[in-house]
Regions:
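Generic secondary-structure microfeatures
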Residues: 38, 44-48, 67, 75, ...
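N-terminal secretory signal peptides that target proteins for export/translocation
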Residues: 1-7
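Bacterial N-terminal signal peptides
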Residues: 9-21
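N-terminal, post-signal-peptide region of Sec/Tat-exported proteins
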Residues: 54-86
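Intrinsic disorder/low-complexity segments
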Residues: 5, 12-14, 71
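C-terminal/domain-edge helix-coil "capping" segments
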Residues: 26-32, 122-183
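Surface-exposed short loop/turn segments
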Residues: 82-145
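A structural "domain/chain start" motif
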Residues: 21-65, 163, 167-183
């Protein structure tokens, strides 16, 4: 292969991988870590930072309510208290992280990430247990003129979580993830 072809292939691969959009849960079986999940504790990043406000048209409370409603509609239990969460096997929590800034064109630009963390055990020493990311999806880049539209984008990521949860807990798909598009 010539040097020019190598450079072209690298540039093309880099370009394709850097396109904004939904990045799916890894194909290496990450979705299977949702098998047997009894419920999730919900962490919305805004509750700690206060980044969102009514003036921007979006609040952390709205994101929490939207998420809880979608999860309950999908028959996924939402753990309400930290005490209950600490008693739950695997201490799973679903973390919503939205970062944004206002551009000079008066648009909001940013990223959204939805991650499940839960307790895992080290294979080489099963006495070691720690919290780790076991599932996640993200939108690398968005640009909207109204932050209310971010709720819809988060909804797409939640739908991916719900589909992966259903697939992981469906006996027909125990060993193989169905083919599907993430966008």
């Amino acid at each position: 292969m010539t040097k020019a072809k190598s450079v072209f292939r690298f540039a093309f691969a880099y370009f394709c991988c850097s396109l904004p959009g939904v990045v799916p849960a890894q194909e290496m079986g990450e979705w299977r870590t949702l098998r047997g999940l009894g419920g999730v504790y919900l962490i919305v990043e805004d509750e700690k930072t206060g980044r969102f406000n009514v003036a921007d048209g979006l609040t952390g409370d709205q994101l929490r309510q939207d998420t809880e409603e979608k999860l309950r509609s999908a028959k996924i239990s939402v753990i309400k208290t930290q005490e209950e969460w600490l008693k739950t096997s695997g201490t799973p929590y679903l973390h919503i992280n939205i970062n944004y800034y206002l551009t000079s064109a008066r648009k909001y630009s940013g990223s959204i990430e939805l991650v499940l963390e839960q307790e895992v055990v080290m294979v080489r020493d099963n006495s070691i247990k720690l919290q780790a990311r076991t599932w996640g999806v993200k939108i690398d880049e968005f640009e909207v003129d109204n932050l209310q539209k971010v709720r819809g984008e988060l909804g797409k990521l939640l739908q991916q979580f719900i589909e992966d949860y259903r697939n992981a807990n469906n006996s027909a798909s125990i060993n193989q993830r169905p083919n599907k598009s993430c966008s």
